[in-house]
Amino acid sequence: MALLQISEPGLSAAPHQRRLAAGIDLGTTNSLVATVRSGQAETLPDHEGRHLLPSVVHYQQQGHTVGYAARDNAAQDTANTISSVKRMMGRSLADIQARYPHLPYRFKASVNGLPMIDTAAGLLNPVRVSADILKALAARASESLSGELDGVVITVPAYFDDAQRQGTKDAARLAGLHVLRLLNEPTAAAIAYGLDSGKEGVIAVYDLGGGTFDISILRLSRGVFEVLATGGDSALGGDDFDHLLADYIREQAGIADRSDNRVQRELLDAAITAKIALSDADTVRVNVAGWQGEITREQFNDLISALVKRTLLACRRALKDAGVEPQDVLEVVMVGGSTRVPLVRERVGEFFGRTPLTAIDPDKVVAIGAAIQADILVGNKPDSEMLLLDVIPLSLGLETMGGLVEKVIPRNTTIPVARAQDFTTFKDGQTAMSIHVMQGERELVQDCRSLARFALRGIPPLPAGGAHIRVTFQVDADGLLSVTAMEKSTGVEASIQVKPSYGLTDGEIASMIKDSMSFAEQDVKARMLAEQKVEAARVLESLTGALTADAALLSAAERQCIDDAAAHLSAVAQGDDVDAIEQAIKNVDKQTQEFAARRMDQSVRRALKGHSVDEV
């Protein structure tokens, strides 16, 4: 008689069998896939031994190609060859056209304002293009590992917002992949270096890829990876080096026409080739569109110097956020192919006062870190060796009365995280509450970013302050935010998942943090004034209700004194004198003390009416 094998729920019947997992670095210029084999993380090459996969897709009526074959078609069929699609992820069409006016694609807007690219294969959005790149990487991994993947960890820039992260998840699902989690690229690099070298202390991860720049300040201690602060620029990378050099070559060659897409591509290819060559040589010869000439490393350095300086300014801000000085940094990890540029390594070394780490190929280090994390999450090894703590870059909170922002989760809080805070109603009989979710560091709503609005209805009609609403903010491991509001006595609730249609601009992220420091004193004063005005409004609202109900308890003289005090409070509450408003509130309290006592006595008598002392 055959016996049925029964295993514990959630456990494999063959616990010794390794599950197949991969880490994917979905890059702007190039992408990679890596896995852990025999305890070592390694990137997986194609049939020709190439580890990088150009993030380029060429579309035709009967299909598409991805990678090198697609990139080779770029010059001949620019409109149907999509590259750097990561820059378009989560952005509106208007935003893309404003940021990248020279893109050679035929764009059309969908009903929600998101971009659609008109290709020979039809209208495609950035999510679909990204999915095709992910499919190619997954196919490479499945062939190399001789099986289907059980899960993947995909890396994203630290500054990707909710919409961009969600778009990446959607692309993975469209590619048929199970996403174990999204992982910030600098954090993935820290995993790769942290496990290999065992260093403990503060580490800076300088990640300059093709399309984005991220700086993360981390503390590694006893296997714990804690991100102290993050910063960067979501639209600055090696692609910008390429375009600056291409424009320089255009000027030298005297090419004025920008409408010829083929020439545009030739110029860009020549710039990329020259940039790579100048990492090893002092001079390179360029031959493009019938023009021949020389470019020196010094000329190239002059072109990109301002961009490199921008990255160092972001480094300085991140260090300040983390509360550390450059000399406190134990190691500087270099990530991204653009960190091969000698000027970048030189300036970064000067800034931090130490030679940057480049032991792991900067093109591969992110994918390797993602593979290590995927191996843990899929269940192949215990995660007791390592705890990973990411952070949110900007504070999250709610609008409260008076246009104030109440922060629920401060910036640089480690994620995943859930925080709850109780709020109450402002008016008698209030049955609904508007929940306005904010992001930013300032004290007033007008100075912060609106993320979402929703309403909680069905609140029982109680006196002001009688209903209690608990608002819970939950940020998952991928940085996506869910907000739930629940009235505690009835259990009625409403919730929302925040998915902005497009993200912050480059300047907004930096300025929101900078302004919070520049206007700190001014903001505190503005908050104190707003809070006093809210309290004045609450006192006057409550007094009006009391007078309407029980004016008969007052003599004419008493009523006049209270009316005078209330009128004075109403007048000073229109001004900007915090102390005057506070004194006026105290005066109203003083003038109404006897009135409040009589109302209390009356309420007690009404409650006792018809009852004996023994019953009480």
UniProtKB/Swiss-Prot annotation:
UniProt keyword list: ATP-binding, Chaperone, Nucleotide-binding
Keyword Ribosomal protein: no
Phosphoprotein among keywords: no
Gene Ontology terms, MF aspect: ATP binding; ATP hydrolysis activity; ATP-dependent protein folding chaperone; unfolded protein binding
CDD domains, per database record: ASKHA_NBD_HSP70_HscA
Source superkingdom: Bacteria
One GO-annotated biological process of the protein: iron-sulfur cluster assembly
InterPro entries listed in its UniProt record: ATPase_NBD, Heat_shock_70_CS, HscA_NBD, HSP70_C_sf, HSP70_peptide-bd_sf, Hsp_70_fam, ISC_FeS_clus_asmbl_HscA
Function noted in UniProt: Chaperone involved in the maturation of iron-sulfur cluster-containing proteins. Has a low intrinsic ATPase activity which is markedly stimulated by HscB. Involved in the maturation of IscU.
Protein family (similarity comment): Belongs to the heat shock protein 70 family.
Record protein name field: Chaperone protein HscA
